[in-house]
Amino acid sequence: MVTRAVTTAFPPPDLAALAAYFLGQWQFDRTIWEGSEMPQATAVGIFDFISGEVPGQLLYRERGQLRMLAGALGRPILFSRLFDYRFGADRVAVLFADGERVGQPYQSYLLCGKMLVPAADHLCGPDCYNAAYTLDTEDSFTMETFINGPKKRTRVLTVARRCGPEVEPEVSASPA
């Protein structure tokens, strides 16, 4: 397990401290709403932020399982994602690190106190993606993502907690 190497002030005063804050392994719970007050799906899993080869780079690797809450109940759906976070002088740029869009920009954020706020919208076809991070404590944060378009009204709430030495999260394909 990768743990945070440097203890920094909270909230992180700058982007270098923010990179140190994110470094390590986290577990998450996620709730997904699509156009209604009732959640359509939940997900659980783990993600790691590890140092990349470029100064100011963290690589994000997420693994988890998704459960539909209505209609398509059954076995969990396993998923994974990779992103490339670049901590620059004034913003955090997030690039795709898997799939057909490797290296292309996904989101860009500004640090405002205990929040990372979008520096710009991310347009994917007719859909607009926006997310904001709230740094809740030294060892937890939330990320709320909105996806809006002609056929989408999606809200995704991710609650992340740092994994400690006593916590070894598991992501398995067995039903809960």
Question: Language-model segments: which ranges?
Answer:
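Soluble ligand-binding/transfer domains with enclosed cavities or grooves
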Residues: 3-176
